[in-house]
Every structure is written in C-alpha cells, then in structure tokens.
Amino acid sequence: MQLRFEEVDKHFGQLEVIKGFNGEFAQGELVALVGPSGCGKSTLLHLVAGLENPTAGRVLADGEKIPGPSPRRTLVFQEHALYPWLSLQANVAMALELQGVDKASAFEQSKVWLERVSLDGFEHYYPHQVSGGMRQRTALARAFIAKPEVLLLDEPFGALDALTRMALQDVLRELIAEHQPTVLLVTHDVDEALYLADHILVFSARPARVLKTFNMTHCEKSHDLSEFAAERREILRLLGIKTEVGH
C-alpha cells in the first residue's frame, strides 16, 4: 500500500503538532521517523491508522483518503497491549476472529504464527507469565497474522534490553521481507533506525518538520553499523546530540 501525505497540518486545540508535512512512501518500504519526544511522530502514525484526522491537508492510502481504522493498517505500540485474561495463542487468534474468521481456524493459524516468532510451546501461557520480549513477539505475531498492508510501529522495542531488542529487530526484518507491508517506524534509537530502515526522516521539535531524509538502501546491513558512522553522526547532530569530545 502506498502512503502519501499532502501538506498535512495537525492541531490539538491551540497546540500545533505537525505543520505542512509532505511525504510519499512506496509499497514495501520501511521508513523510520526519528526526532525529539513530543514532536508529532506518533501523531503521524495515528493519522495513517485512521485514529485521528488531519486539521488540514490529506493523508492518502493507495490514492484514497483514509476514512477510519482498518485491519489493513495495523498499529503496534511499545506496550504490547495484549489482553491479560487471554493466552498468547488466544491473543494472536483474536486478530483473525475480529475479521470474522471462525475460532478453530484462527487458533490453528495463531499456533503457526507463534512458531514463526519462536514461541512454540508457549501457546497456553498468559502474558504475565512470560518475559517482555516474549510478549512483544506475541504482539508481532498478532500484527502479521492479519496480513496488514501497512504496519505502524510506535517504539515497539523501546522497553526491552539491548540483546532482546536486537533479536526482535531480526525477527521483524524477516517478517517484513516475506510479507512486504509498508512500514512506518517511530524510534528514538538511531542505531535501530539505521539497521531497519530503507529511509530515515529526521524531524525537528514541534511542530514537526523534516530536517533531512537519509536513503539507507545502498548496501546490505548487519548489526555492525560501522559503515554508517557518518550517517549516525549527522543524525545525532541534527537532533542536537554532541558526539565528539571537546578539547
């Protein structure tokens, strides 16, 4: 699904969050949105999800104005938002049941998806019985089982330790490569953006405007990001973070 923003403004009362944002994102691209807290990055996700309407301008999906929420556009939060009274398998199956899939088929498919994210054997566990990383793996399975055309990720790994975060980044890359949704990723982790994204948009403080766009499609990536040192320094500079020790 292609996404397009045309001169988008968003206000909350007198608070101007987004001003004149333009952008076009192709099917299958992963675009990372990086910027200061509160600058409007998450609001852009909410506009695509259909949870908010722009104050001015248009947000289009495949050339059509977004009328409201749809399972074609799935939002994943930092907090996994699993139902605590349901097992992991039931949580994943719920995404299909809400689309009218019968329970038996939904549970069968959810078992397969839990295996895809290395949670086979944990189908009958409840969210409080597993680690944060396992809960977020479940959230990814629930997001992908419905085969969304757009995946909206709001700091999905921000609450996890470094090793778990890296492992889940790899899981996410594999799933995206296989299913090719268009992905918007909000993150404060510059290394995560460098590793995952095809393009990185660096935003100013509120109201959000794009300071610079980085194209990251020019080579294969690994968790060794040393070849992206120049891009990393430039992104941090744009964010106002000092990277060199003064003398």
Describe the role of every protein-language-model region.
Residues 76, 140:
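Hydrophobic anchor residue at the start of the ABC signature
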Residues 49:
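Helix-to-loop junction immediately C-terminal to a conserved catalytic motif
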Residues 125-128, 146:
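Conserved signature/switch motifs of ABC ATPase nucleotide-binding domains
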Residues 57-69:
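Conserved ABC transporter NBD signature motif
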Residues 151-154:
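Catalytic Walker B motif of ABC-type/P-loop ATPase nucleotide-binding domains
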Residues 34-36:
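The feature captures the beta-strand-to-loop junction immediately N-terminal to the Walker
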Residues 89-97, 107, 111, 215:
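Short helical segment in ABC ATPase nucleotide-binding domains corresponding to the A-loop/adjacent helical element
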